[in-house]
Amino acid sequence: MKTVTISKERLRIHIEQLGEIGKTKDKGVQRLALSKEDREATLLVSEWMREAGLTVTHDHFGNLIGRKEGETPSLPSVMIGSHIDSVRNGGKFDGVIGVLAGIEIVHAISEANVVHEHSIEVVAFCEEEGSRFNDGLFGSRGMVGKVKPEDLQKVDDNNVTRYEALKTFGFGIDPDFTHQSIREIGDIKHYFEMHIEQGPYLEKNNYPIGIVSGIAGPSWFKVRLVGEAGHAGTVPMSLRKDPLVGAAEVIKEVETLCMNDPNAPTVGTVGRIAAFPGGSNIIPESVEFTLDIRDIELERRNKIIEKIEEKIKLVSNTRGLEYQIEKNMAAVPVKCSENLINSLKQSCKELEIDAPIIVSGAGHDAMFLAEITEIGMVFVRCRNGISHSPKEWAEIDDILTGTKVLYESIIKHI
């Protein structure tokens, strides 16, 4: 086997340079999917892919794909992926380290002239976060045939549809031809992804990385409660139809339901809430808020969602409100491949790295790729477990460790 060097310095520089695109005033990152910042980042990452020896294309779901052909191109490819879009005012490591690790692995393989039978693909999936169209994991869902026509009609805060955003993004993307970009079982041999943990376990227990055994399935909703607007000073409390108070009742119930079983990893979050018309002296006419419910057990998650829906109906009936529940996305919890878990464990053993087996509470592109191939994931510890924040931070030495482990496993499968 030829000696291969993973460049810590190149990884560090790439992370820093990409972090400058969409940089916010408090040193966070805001690169919403299919935005001008996303386009600028795509151009830069495409350049790095080419430097690593990858041929760059886009599919019609907006996924950026770099491919290095193997000796037998007809064989299924080995894919490494993640995302480069961000949440609003997020951090510079989330998703990014997975894409850049993939590029660095191919860079090292190219520099050492390593011969491989299977082609290697590095993918930056479109809109993993869902922060623009409130509908995440779009690119990976599309790749496995799970995007519906109505998903293309989702609108952002400026009433721009995803279809329009894709159509004008460039790079040959045409949402009228998404059917041409669907992969089938047998097209991809294995899928690997590296990501920051986005939680405190690894740091608390002094592990640089962890091996993921499974991914909790998120379910996203948008709830709208409609009441009756009125003057804040003249409508008695007993006669009000205030949807914001109703929303508060529902939100408190979300917390209660998700904490009922102290041994369960169930989590529920209301991340966005807006009252209309939004005047300080006006009783709101309507309120919209998002719901994010996650669990590693599908049945338990679905039961909690049923109870939340019952609470919404009860509150609405009691307070004289109308309600709408829009289901935006639901992902089934998935387990990582035992084959790839064992491969990653063996790589850790060879490199003398102690890595625990952990569950991912966050959703990742890997969970949809699992529908057509085996998946393997590596987590990198992050400071204080913070993510989706300008305070998000991962040490370059830990990122390097994860990249080396990923390389040692991938090289055995190509």
From Swiss-Prot:
One biological process term in Gene Ontology: amino acid biosynthetic process
Binding locations of an N-carbamoyl-L-alpha-amino acid: Q198, H231, N281, R294, G363
Chain intervals for the UniProt region annotation (Involved in dimerization): 214-333
The enzyme's E.C. designation: 3.5.1.87
Catalytic activity, reaction form: an N-carbamoyl-L-alpha-amino acid + H2O + 2 H(+) = an L-alpha-amino acid + NH4(+) + CO2; N-carbamoyl-L-methionine + H2O + 2 H(+) = L-methionine + NH4(+) + CO2
CDD domains in alphabetical order: M20_bAS
Requisite cofactors: Mn(2+); Ni(2+); Co(2+); Fe(2+)
Ion transport listed as a keyword: no
Entry keyword set: Amino-acid biosynthesis, Cobalt, Hydrolase, Iron, Manganese, Metal-binding, Nickel, Plasmid
A Pfam family: Peptidase_M20
Binding sites annotated in the UniProt record for a divalent metal cation 2: D94, E129, H388
Presence of the UniProt keyword Amino-acid biosynthesis in the record: yes
Binding positions for a divalent metal cation 1 per the UniProt entry: H83, D94, H195
Subunit structure: Homodimer.
Family: Belongs to the peptidase M20 family.
Name of the protein this chain belongs to: N-carbamoyl-L-amino-acid amidohydrolase
Organism (species): Pseudomonas sp. (strain NS671)
Lineage: Bacteria, Pseudomonadati, Pseudomonadota
